[in-house]
UniProtKB/Swiss-Prot annotation:
Residues on Extracellular side: 25-339
Keyword match Signal: yes
Subcellular localization: Golgi apparatus membrane
Membrane-traversing stretches: 340-360
InterPro entries according to UniProt: Ig-like_fold, PKAT, PKAT_KLD, PKD_dom, PKD_dom_sf
Domain of life: Eukaryota
Protein source organism: Pongo abelii
Membrane topology: Single-pass type I membrane protein
Residues spanning the signal sequence: 1-24
Cytoplasmic side: 361-423
Keyword Transmembrane helix carried by entry: yes
Residues covered by the PKD domain: 147-233
Name assigned to this protein: Transmembrane protein 130
Record: glycosylation sites: N34, N197, N300
Length: 423
């Protein structure tokens, strides 16, 4: 293999040295090559590469009428050439790769009578050869959702495996398919197409393992069972359409009373919710309200009404699949608690002020009365002692009464004198 690579490099270097000495009569730079290939391919399968000579200015330049004036040159080592065909101004080759890897294939066009002349056009393509099966896992559903990899729950999905084998290398092989749908369901089939229905929302990965077996005749005329495998997967996002919005909340409320509505969405999040109060139940127009992102299937909406009247909550919700509208009527009555709320503090304040005024008035009146009844307040310790402690310091009650009469001369005598007559 190393010798073949060095041989190819030597040939390219040799051509690069000879090209500058080629005549310039050929229309170099006016044409280009369009290359197509059916790569990637599995090892042992044929790969087709085609090259077509076209004008660079998208067709305004006329192509040569005689196709025999030009010749195509290919370099495809270490790939094995299995076929070559030329028709008009195009050339096609078929090659086979027996080891996996990335392999460049080069092609250029020269005048047919001067293959060492400067190329009219050149190009190259890289072939991808793998030891595994080549194919695609395709998921389809009878819906027209504009979002890639998004599908509906409770709707049949068609999952297909499309084998990429343009050379029919595996036309005699038997295939076995092992499916894993990512929700715990697994199955093994001999058919490359299955139908499945997801009942829950979420993101799932469908995994498929393909095994191909066939018989191959060896050079010694013996038969051997050959096998190739391949692993494929596809990511699916299962969504639910919004079937409606359930609104839980009062339909009658008073002003200045906080109201809470609970919105239950019958669909899969994430959602975009928008609402607005209107006199009538009419759908919301675009840009009429501010959208709110909701990551669950429930949302609480709060509002306080200041004016009585009839209102309607216009609610709109949407996810990446669908949208829906809902309405909720509510009547707002004037609040009965509102006057009492303002009157009670005022009445309390007035009552406190009146009580304080009455207290101060009675206090001043009591002080003035005491001053009138006692114009000359007693002085010294003697008066205080006589008034307060007299009954305890005097020996007899008669002495206490005499002292009282001295201090209160205006009081009448406590008893009248008794006269005694002797006959």
């Amino acid at each position: 293999m190393a010798q073949a690579v060095w041989s190819r490099l030597g040939r390219i270097l040799w051509l690069s040295c000879l090209l500058p000495w080629a005549p310039a009569g050929v229309a170099a730079g006016l044409y280009e090559l369009n290359l197509t290939t059916d790569s990637p391919a599995t090892t042992g399968a044929e790969v087709t590469i085609s090259a077509s000579l076209v004008a660079k200015d998208n067709g305004s330049l006329a192509l040569p009428a005689d196709a025999h004036l030009y010749r195509f040159h290919w370099i495809h080592t270490p790939l094995v050439l299995t076929g070559k065909a030329e028709k008009g101004l195009s050339s096609t080759i078929r090659v086979v790769g027996h080891v996996p890897g990335e392999f460049p294939v080069s092609v250029w066009v020269t005048a047919s009578d001067c293959w060492m002349c400067q190329p009219v056009a050149r190009g190259f393509v890289v072939l991808h050869i793998t030891e595994f099966l080549v194919g695609d896992l395709v998921v389809t559903q009878n819906t027209s959702l504009p979002w890639p990899s998004s599908y509906l729950t409770k709707t049949i999905l068609k999952v297909s495996f499309l084998l990429h084998d343009p050379s029919d290398f595996l036309k005699t092989a038997l295939f076995l398919y092992s499916w894993d749908f990512g929700d715990g369901t697994q199955m093994v089939t001999e058919d490359s197409v299955v139908y499945y229905n997801y009942s829950i929302i979420g993101t799932f990965t469908v995994k498929l393992k393909v095994v191909a077996e066939w018989e191959e005749v060896k050079p010694d005329a013996t038969k051997a069972v050959m096998q190739k495998t391949g692993d494929f997967s596809a990511s699916l996002k299962l969504q639910e359409t919004l079937r409606g919005i359930q609104v839980l909340g009062p339909t009658l409320i008073q002003t200045f009373q906080k109201m809470t509505l609970t919105l239950n969405f019958l669909g899969s999040p994430p959602l975009t919710v928008c609402w607005r109060l209107k006199p009538e139940c009419l759908p919301l127009e675009e840009g009429e309200c501010h959208p709110v992102s909701v990551a669950s299937t429930a949302y609480n909406l709060t509002h306080t009404f200041r004016d009585p009247g009839d209102y309607c909550f216009s609610i709109r919700a949407e996810n990446i699949i669908s949208k829906t509208h809902q309405y909720h009527r509510i009547q707002v009555w004037p609040s009965r608690i509102q006057p009492a709320v303002f009157a009670f503090p005022c009445a309390t304040l007035i009552t406190v002020m009146l009580a304080f005024i009455m207290y101060m008035t009675l206090r001043n009146a009591t002080q003035q009365k005491d001053m009138v009844e006692n114009p000359e307040p007693p002085s010294g310790v003697r008066c205080c002692c006589q008034m307060c402690c007299g009954p305890f310091l005097l020996e007899t009650p008669s002495e206490y009464l005499e002292i009282v009469r001295e201090n209160h001369g205006l009081l009448p005598p406590l008893y009248k004198s008794v006269k005694t007559y002797t006959v």
